[in-house]
Amino acid sequence: MNYFDNKIDQFATYLQKRNNLDHIQFLQVRLGMQVLAKNIGKLIVMYTLAYILNIFIFTLITNISFYLIRRYAHGAHAPSSFWCYIESITLFIVLPLLVLHFHINETLMMFLALLSVGVVIKYAPAATKKKPIPARLVKQKRYFSIIISTILFIITLFVKEPYTQFIQLGIIIQAITLLPIYYSKED
């Protein structure tokens, strides 16, 4: 166990005693804190790299656009924490660098973003085996996924370049995670 795991265990044990949690609740709290710690670590690495590469704002815009839709649309996940790091760096560092330096055609990006909104309309929300969506929430999540992706697309019609392309990139990345090609691999 590393330092952070020890601190998480200590804090989870403290919360268990203080709030009279049973063992299952303790494990849920501990897992939640472990996931949070890993995600914060990934964000620090990703945004530090973005800052060093002078693309912080573009990474932030792409990531926020992605997350706003993903919160309701869900979608495929990396198979492990290691692959999550690799995918995060590829999607939110490498792709924004490519968009920035290769000046991707605006019409092409607009078309891909519009197509991606169509993917969100067709496939959101996309549950996974490990992260199922309760039936009572599917309709609401679908509605918000469509509304948010549509609003983001409309915003791109009014925002200046290059920011437009990074909002569009976030929409495109999230739409790709919704495609059914990822779900046969999970079963």
From Swiss-Prot:
Its EC number is 3.4.-.-. GO terms for biological process: proteolysis; quorum sensing. Its main location: membrane. Pfam families: AgrB. It is a multi-pass membrane protein. It is found in: Cell membrane. Coiled coil: none annotated. GO terms for cellular component: plasma membrane. Keywords: Cell membrane, Hydrolase, Membrane, Protease, Quorum sensing, Transmembrane, Transmembrane helix, Virulence. The chain crosses the membrane at residues 49-69, 82-102, 107-127, 143-163, 164-184. GO terms for molecular function: peptidase activity. Essential for the production of a quorum sensing system signal molecule, the autoinducing peptide (AIP). This quorum sensing system is responsible for the regulation of the expression of virulence factor genes. Involved in the proteolytic processing of AgrD, the precursor of AIP. Belongs to the AgrB family. This is Accessory gene regulator protein B. It comes from Staphylococcus aureus (strain MRSA252). The lineage of its organism: Bacteria, Bacillati, Bacillota, Bacilli, Bacillales.
